[in-house]
Amino acid sequence: MRKSGIVTGAGLLLASLLGVVAAHADDMLGSYVARISDRDHQASDGYALDNAAQMVRQDRANWHKFHRRDSDDEADGWFRTNGQRADLQRMLERGGAMSSSTKRAIVNGEPLIQVDVYEN
């Protein structure tokens, strides 16, 4: 898979640089950067993941649980547990959470993403 450009996020939402989605909360807690690499395209038990939200969740599982980290990955203080990662996936699966181009970049490539985390 080829590496693609930087994708920026807002409020646990990922958006392409051309279509940034407004944050749904006022207080930003922080952010992290992650490379959604080929290893994030597969679940822990080896089956292929089929959507971008699953892949972002798997990236955080690879970071926190399995210590399989890409060189571009940064730590976060919000998605340490399976339950927290499930919440992240649910948020990202909401309509409008990610643009179509962002989803395609994640599913079909290895983009570098930034996730901004907001309270609420």
List each model region and its residues.
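Solvent-exposed, flexible loop/coil residues
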Residues: G5, D40, G83
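N-terminal leader/targeting segments
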Residues: L18-A53
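Classic N-terminal secretory signal peptides
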Residues: M1-A25
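Soluble periplasmic/extracytoplasmic beta-strand elements of cell-envelope proteins
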Residues: V33-S37, M91, Q114-Y118
